[in-house]
């Protein structure tokens, strides 16, 4: 058996009961170091822990796949929710196993940020840049999102395209630098790490950051008047 599950945005309090049950009954728990650390208190002492990084993930997932094919209960843990951000890792798991695997949803950092920032997804678009390959199509989509008067929640690419790079790219494409921006690094806190405008977003943030770019003109309420 092998299952891939999201574990929430970085704190065990956001772990779903379904994911907790899977992890607590696993023979093998695998994932990137920071993700495994989130659920380490739930992993049974009898379980084998397989941690990985960007450079050795293919070899480590092949190790997990061998355990799966040997009949062990394997759980691969993902930060947030797999289908919000992490689909390329899921592809690697399935390639190693040679078949499609079951996925279990988690709570995404985008959902927590929407709650913290008090924005709703009918007025907000979510984009993840946390992927390998060409980002240009996704960035062009981000420009259209902002031109359409919507908010944007954006997960940066931690190794080379962070909030300051996103802001600089947008401003260079004539997106107004006056868009209000929030960057969050720890979503268990009640306040953003940084608030300002797109034009002022020039500082460095950790690889756990997520960005909210607000529309210049918030949508008016469409509920009936009191």
Predicted feature locations:
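Short loop/edge segments at beta-strand edges and connector loops
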Residues: 53, 105, 128, 185
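Flexible, glycine/proline-enriched loop segments at strand-loop-helix junctions
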Residues: 78, 100, 125-130, 151-158
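Short, glycine-/small-residue-rich phosphate/pyrophosphate-handling segment
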Residues: 114-144, 148
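Short, well-ordered secondary-structure micro-motifs
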Residues: 42, 87-88, 113-116, 137-139, ...
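A contiguous loop/helix-start segment that scaffolds small-molecule binding in enzyme catalytic cores
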Residues: 2-4, 72-74, 82, 146-226
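Short, structured loop/turn "capping" segments at alpha-beta junctions
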Residues: 103, 120-125, 176-181
């Amino acid at each position: 058996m092998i299952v891939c599950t999201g574990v929430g945005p970085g704190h065990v309090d956001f772990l779903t009961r379904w994911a907790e049950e899977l992890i607590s009954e696993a023979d093998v728990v695998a994932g990137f170091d920071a993700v495994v650390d989130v659920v380490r208190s739930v992993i049974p002492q009898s379980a084998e822990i397989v941690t990985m990084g960007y450079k050795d993930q293919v070899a480590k997932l092949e190790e997990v796949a061998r355990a799966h094919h040997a009949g062990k209960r394997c759980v691969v843990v993902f930060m947030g929710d797999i289908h919000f951000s992490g689909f390329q890792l899921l592809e690697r798991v399935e390639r190693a196993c040679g078949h499609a695997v079951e996925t279990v949803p988690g709570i995404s950092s985008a959902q927590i940020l929407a709650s913290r920032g008090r924005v709703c997804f009918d007025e907000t678009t979510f984009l993840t840049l946390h992927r390998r390959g060409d980002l240009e199509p996704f960035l062009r989509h981000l420009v259209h999102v902002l031109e359409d008067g919507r908010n944007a929640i954006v997960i940066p690419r931690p190794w080379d395209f962070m909030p300051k790079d996103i802001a600089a790219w947008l401003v260079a494409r004539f997106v107004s630098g006056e868009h209000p921006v929030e960057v969050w690094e720890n979503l268990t806190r009640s306040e953003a790490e940084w608030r300002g405008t797109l034009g002022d977003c020039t500082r460095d943030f950790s690889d756990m950051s997520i960005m909210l770019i607000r529309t210049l003109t918030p949508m008016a309420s469409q509920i009936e008047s009191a």
